[in-house]
Amino acid sequence: AVTPVYFRLAAVITGSELGNSVSNVVKVSQVKLGEVVSTIELPEEMYLVGSSIGTAWGTWQPMVSVNGLAGEFWSMVYFDAGAEFKFGKFEQDWNGYSKIHQFKDNAGAGLSDSGDNIKVSKGGWYIVYLVAEVNGEDYQYTLSFYKPDVYVLGSTVGDWNYNEAYKFSVPEDKNGSFVSPTLTATGEVRMCIKADTDWWRLEFTLKDGAT
C-alpha cells in the first residue's frame, strides 16, 4: 500500500540547548508500506464429510489434488437429495457454508445453507471442486459443482480432446457403475474429469495398470 507521510526535522547543538530548531511540516506524497507476510500456507490435503459420504458424518473422504495447482482439489461424490456436507484440511476440521467465499453451481445441484452445512437439493453424482486461497491469516474458499463427466483420451481412442463419443455413462444411483466407451486401440488407458482447467491436470488411470 502507498500512503502520504507528514514529518518535521529537529536539530540541536550536541551537549547544549543552543540552536534548538524545528522545521516546517514536510509532506512525502508516496511512501510504500511494508508488505504483510502471511504465516499460513496453502493446504496440501482436503477432505469431505457428510450425510451421504461413507459412514454418515464419520467418514472423511480425501479429495484428489489437482496436478500442478496448489490448494485445488476435486472428488466425485454421490449425494442423496437433501444431503448435507462439510469439508476440512484434515479430519475433524469442520468447515461449512460460512467458510465458502464463492459458490459456482455449474451442475444445477441447488446448493444452500443448512445450519452451516452445505445442502445439496438435487440428488445425484457430482464433481466437487474446491479451491483454497490464503487471505491474510485465514483461508478463502471457492466451491464448484460440475456434472459427473468422465472421458477417455489418448491412444486407446485416438483422440486427445473431450469427445462425447468417448465419455463414460453415468449411473443413476450410488450403487451403479460408470461404464467406459469401447476402446479402439491398445495402449495406456488415460481418463480425466471435466472442469474449468486443463484436462491433464485432472487425469487419472488404472490402479496398478489393471483396476
Regions inferred by a protein language model and the residue ranges of each:
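Insoluble glucan recognition modules
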Residues: 1-211
